């Protein structure tokens, strides 16, 4: 596999250097479309006029036809200024583009001021439940080195164990990098799937999922456009060095350059800390972690309408598993002997090659994306000491524990094909996703007084998704997004489902959109999720493999209202209801913090969420508030040796990640004539998780934290240094995230950490 990645890198670099053609913008491949008309105040079309679309890092231009129509088929998600200069005057509008959305705008040229005759929000693909973070916004956030911390800023998402984002009451998010899928199992690893320092923009869907997305756990969809936050384009690079409390230090090297018409973006990152995972003790023991990652993107324009792009990522992370050595701690009954040295190492490699052809009239495109991913998770348990660990029971007796060594390798290969075509009132997209996974797993369980349990397994699985969707602009004020998706999966278990999706957006008043959505979702468990837990946890009377984990099937409904106050200020409120059968849920594996997956026979989450988002030259801010109730019942499958259909008691009880109120807010203010100096205040609030699992009794106390960052962005033009001083958990507020209950380990949040970073550009 290493040789493959090296050979692919050399081949693509050679092709990029050898080919030459006219340049087009090297846009990433997570896009929507913009189309419209340009007219005068007399409603007559204006032809042969230049229309320009300008965003954070993208500038696109086109010319209107004789009928005044214009189109941009591939526009990366984000906020844009749309403008046109004509003999009759100027026309302009501010618009927001979401992935897979079609934005229709009617520009009217006037001698004094430009305006849109129809609000751009009117026909957005997702006027609610979609939020985007630009490079400028990301760079100013205090915890912008953690993708989970960014995702958890939006409504509907709760920060759970080990910073896992739980979206709308369910585990598992779908991640995409530059338009290519990044498969992830529900039993996720500790490391980051994508280093956010390599991101130029992040978009998060928590609802209104288009038919394009599906097949795996989909509490939310996270789209990432690569490029980094430091530079605004062109050639150049930067070196960032940082150090701070808790043994923290990090380094980042980036380089953007061109060779012929090819554009290269290279990033190298490394970091370490003495406080990695949430610890079972207030003062952490054995909790260091480190990570390195390398990312390369090559974009090669091949004419005015063709683009070839290549992504290559390599990551490594190592985590000491924190321990509790105090037998008298009532919050942490699992006790390890001093010196226990369990370690998890994680390796990840990813490569994708995308080819995009845009039609001559700008109203369509075709994309082909082959991709590969290799992932290895190795848990190296300190077996001799692990079997000396024990759990203190309520009556004062103790129960001895087991030791675990695990080495799991998953290899993925996939192909994504899609085609898009827009007309006056319709935007049709269809595609197919093919994925194959090969899993090799080796487990050793050492049990005091019993023979070792050894389980070596290998399996192959597939996922196939086929979809078609249409964005129909029914009237000037109503748009309908309808889609149909078919998913089929094989592996230890298999299944299939036909999933309709329907979304209606109605501008009921000027700049106010009523939104409704209905969708069916299908989630196949990854091969990594399906293991012999019943044997490993000694709940089965036989050593025969039992693979009874079933695919999850959801019905999701939402009703919302969005209002655009100005082009830089919008708000929405959204009510959601999600019901599921065979919920893919998680519990701890033995006495480790690793996740094992099981089924709940039924599950339901209901809630109401609010978002206020503002962005201007001087201020970036956002407020999110969610009230929700997540319940499940009928524990079965995986660890529990009976199929979901035979569960006797399916009374709904609060999930262990159920949190009644969750709030997030951030405020960034920019200063100085060049607006490069900034200060950000960020806050988080939660009312606490249940103490036990699905028993309905007891809650941990409410908690809150505040983070701060101040700094100045580096100036690559004048070659001036940049710096950032960030403070996580400003007031050093400590709280219990979870307590050990058989499904979760005890976890304390991290103490205050101050980190200073300096950036030298060139």
Give the ranges of each region predicted by the language model.
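Membrane-embedded beta-barrel scaffold of Gram-negative outer-membrane proteins
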Residues: 262, 365-383, 507, 515, ...
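Short, acidic, small-residue-rich periplasmic hinge/interaction motif at the N-terminus
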Residues: 39-41, 50-54, 83-88, 98-140, ...
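Transmembrane beta-barrel wall of Gram-negative outer-membrane proteins
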Residues: 243-272, 282-322, 343-365, 422-424
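C-terminal beta-signal and adjacent terminal beta-strands/loops
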Residues: 4, 684-690, 712-762
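A beta-strand signature from Gram-negative outer-membrane beta-barrel systems
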Residues: 153-154, 194-238
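Gram-negative outer-membrane beta-barrel transporters
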Residues: 475, 575-579, 598-690
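Surface-exposed extracellular loop regions of Gram-negative outer-membrane beta-barrel proteins
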Residues: 318, 324-331, 440-445, 492, ...
């Amino acid at each position: 596999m290493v040789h493959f990645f090296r050979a692919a890198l050399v081949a693509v670099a050679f092709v990029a250097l050898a080919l030459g053609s006219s340049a087009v913008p090297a846009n990433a491949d997570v896009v929507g479309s913009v189309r419209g008309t340009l007219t005068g105040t007399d409603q007559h079309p204006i032809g042969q006029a230049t229309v320009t679309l300008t965003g954070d890092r993208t500038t696109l231009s086109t010319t209107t036809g004789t009928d005044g129509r214009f189109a941009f088929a591939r526009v990366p998600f984000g906020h844009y200024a749309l403008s046109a200069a004509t003999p009759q005057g100027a026309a302009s509008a501010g618009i927001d583009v979401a992935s897979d959305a079609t934005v229709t705008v009617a520009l009217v040229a006037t001698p004094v001021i430009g305006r849109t005759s129809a609000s751009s929000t009117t026909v957005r693909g997702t006027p609610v439940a979609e939020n985007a973070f630009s490079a400028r916004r990301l760079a100013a956030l205090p915890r912008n080195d953690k993708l989970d911390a960014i995702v958890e800023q939006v409504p509907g998402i709760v920060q759970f164990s080990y910073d896992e984002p739980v979206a709308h009451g369910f585990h598992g998010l779908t991640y995409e990098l530059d338009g290519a899928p990044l498969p992830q199992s529900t039993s996720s690893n500790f490391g980051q799937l994508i280093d956010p320092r390599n991101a130029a923009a992040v978009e998060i869907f928590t609802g209104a999922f288009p038919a394009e997305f599906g097949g795996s756990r989909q509490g939310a969809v996270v789209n990432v456009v690569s490029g980094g936050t430091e530079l605004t384009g062109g050639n150049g690079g930067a070196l960032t060095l940082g150090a701070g409390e808790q043994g923290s230090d990090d380094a980042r090297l980036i380089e953007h350059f061109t060779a012929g018409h090819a554009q290269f973006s290279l990033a190298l990152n490394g970091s370490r800390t003495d406080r990695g995972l949430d610890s079972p003790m207030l003062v952490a023991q054995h909790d260091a972690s480190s990570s390195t990652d390398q990312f390369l993107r090559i974009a090669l324009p091949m004419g005015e309408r063709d683009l070839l792009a290549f992504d290559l990522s390599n990551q490594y992370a190592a985590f000491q598993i924190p321990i509790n050595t105090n037998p008298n701690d009532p919050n942490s009954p699992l006790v390890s002997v001093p010196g226990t040295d369990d370690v998890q190492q994680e390796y990840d490699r990813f490569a994708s090659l995308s080819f995009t052809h845009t039609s001559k009239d700008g109203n369509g495109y075709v994309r082909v994306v082959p991709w590969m991913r290799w992932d290895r998770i190795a848990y190296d348990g300190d077996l001799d000491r692990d079997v000396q660990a024990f759990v203190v029971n309520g009556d004062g007796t103790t129960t001895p524990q087991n030791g675990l060594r695990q080495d799991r390798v998953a290899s993925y290969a996939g192909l994504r094909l899609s085609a898009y075509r827009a007309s006056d009132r319709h935007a049709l997209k269809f595609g197919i996703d093919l994925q194959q996974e090969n899993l090799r797993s080796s487990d050793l369980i050492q049990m005091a007084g019993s023979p070792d349990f050894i389980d070596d397994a290998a399996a192959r699985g597939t996922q196939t998704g086929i979809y078609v969707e249409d964005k129909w602009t029914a009237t000037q004020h109503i748009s309908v997004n309808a889609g149909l998706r078919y998913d089929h999966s094989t592996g230890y278990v298999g299944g299939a489902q036909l999933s309709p999706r329907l979304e209606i957006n109605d501008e009921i008043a000027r700049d106010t959109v009523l939104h409704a959505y209905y969708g069916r979702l299908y989630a196949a468990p990854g091969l990594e999720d399906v293991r012999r837990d019943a044997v490993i946890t000694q709940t089965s009377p036989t050593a025969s493999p039992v693979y009874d984990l079933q695919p999850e099937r959801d019905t999701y409904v939402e009703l919302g209202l969005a209002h655009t106050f100005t082009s830089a200020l919008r708000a929405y409120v959204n009510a959601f209801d999600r019901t599921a059968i065979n919920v893919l849920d998680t519990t701890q594996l033995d006495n480790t913090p690793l996740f094992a997956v099981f089924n709940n026979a039924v599950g339901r989450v209901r809630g109401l969420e609010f978002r206020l988002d503002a962005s201007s030259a001087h201020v970036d801010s956002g407020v999110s508030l969610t009230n929700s109730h997540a319940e499940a019942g009928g524990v079965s499958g995986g660890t529990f040796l009976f199929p979901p259909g035979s569960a006797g008691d399916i009374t709904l009880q609060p999930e262990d990640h159920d949190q009644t109120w969750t709030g997030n807010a951030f405020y960034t203010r920019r200063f100085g004539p060049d607006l490069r100096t900034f200060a950000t205040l960020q806050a988080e609030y939660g009312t606490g998780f249940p103490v036990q699992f699905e028993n309905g009794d007891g809650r941990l106390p409410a908690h809150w934290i505040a983070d701060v960052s101040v700094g100045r962005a580096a100036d690559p033009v004048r070659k001036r240094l940049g710096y950032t001083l960030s403070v996580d958990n400003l007031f050093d507020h400590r709280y219990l995230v979870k307590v050990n209950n058989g499904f979760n380990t005890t976890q304390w949040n991290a103490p205050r950490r101050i980190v200073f970073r300096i950036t030298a550009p060139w």
